[in-house]
């Protein structure tokens, strides 16, 4: 589940935080490009590889994002699932077993270093990363090797706000790539990000278990 949150958080944080340090100029350029996006719909393909680059998992789906904190991800295929943020609760729903897990969005952020990095407007956190730009690619590399930081991540976004790809390299050398297509930035109705709990769905409520 957390793999889908990374992309969402990057857009939310970078689009809302403030550029205050000249040495972070590539970050400011990226922020300005992401500021072109208030609503986002894309098709995505997620590929997960280990260090030998052997593909181990391929996932397809659709993604809706509405700033500042609304998110709807539909994973297609035999393992269909939905990940929905209504701004307060993060719902993870698996229709084949009629079960939904509810998480407090704030708690998810506070218990994950990567999500703290992406949600909190704290320039000291960003100083833990070296940020560089090469054309439409923006690269983030951790200054630490402590297992607490995402080792590297990168995003490709044009000066028109079109996001093509987003990648993460974790400490265990796992490589996660997202390929995006059919991007649309039209207004998304707020109702899209609501989850209705019906009587036939089993609830696993984790909102108070942190």
UniProtKB/Swiss-Prot annotation:
Alphabetized CDD domains for the sequence: LolA
GO cellular component annotations of the record: outer membrane-bounded periplasmic space
Main location: periplasm
NCBIfam families: lolA
Pfam family, one: LolA
Family assignment from sequence similarity: Belongs to the LolA family.
GN (gene name): lolA
Coiled-coil ranges from the UniProt annotation: none
GO biological process: lipoprotein localization to outer membrane; lipoprotein transport
Signal peptide: 1-23
Annotated localization: Periplasm
Physiological role: Participates in the translocation of lipoproteins from the inner membrane to the outer membrane. Only forms a complex with a lipoprotein if the residue after the N-terminal Cys is not an aspartate (The Asp acts as a targeting signal to indicate that the lipoprotein should stay in the inner membrane).
Protein name: Outer-membrane lipoprotein carrier protein
Species of provenance: Blochmanniella floridana
Subunit structure of this chain's protein: Monomer.
Organism lineage: Bacteria, Pseudomonadati, Pseudomonadota, Gammaproteobacteria, Enterobacterales
Entry keyword set: Chaperone, Periplasm, Protein transport, Signal, Transport
């Amino acid at each position: 589940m957390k793999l889908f949150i990374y992309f969402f958080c990057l857009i939310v944080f970078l689009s809302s935080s403030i550029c205050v340090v000249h040495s972070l100029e590539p970050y400011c350029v990226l922020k300005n490009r992401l500021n072109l996006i208030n609503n986002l719909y894309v098709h995505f393909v997620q590929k997960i590889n280990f260090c030998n680059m052997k593909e181990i998992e391929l996932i397809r789906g659709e993604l809706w994002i509405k700033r500042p904190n609304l998110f709807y991800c539909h994973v297609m295929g035999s393992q269909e699932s939905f990940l929905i943020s209504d701004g307060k609760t993060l719902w993870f729903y698996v229709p084949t077993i009629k079960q939904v897990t509810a998480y407090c969005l704030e708690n998810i952020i506070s218990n994950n270093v990567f999500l703290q990095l992406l949600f909190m407007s704290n320039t000291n956190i960003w100083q833990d990363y070296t940020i560089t730009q090469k054309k439409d690619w923006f690269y983030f590399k951790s200054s630490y090797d402590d297992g607490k930081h995402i080792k590297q991540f990168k995003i490709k976004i044009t000066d028109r706000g079109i996001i093509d790809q987003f990648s993460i390299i974790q400490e265990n050398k796992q490589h996660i790539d997202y390929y995006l297509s059919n991007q649309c930035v039209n207004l998304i109705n707020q109702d899209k990000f609501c989850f209705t709990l019906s009587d036939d769905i089993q609830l696993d409520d984790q909102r108070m278990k942190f």
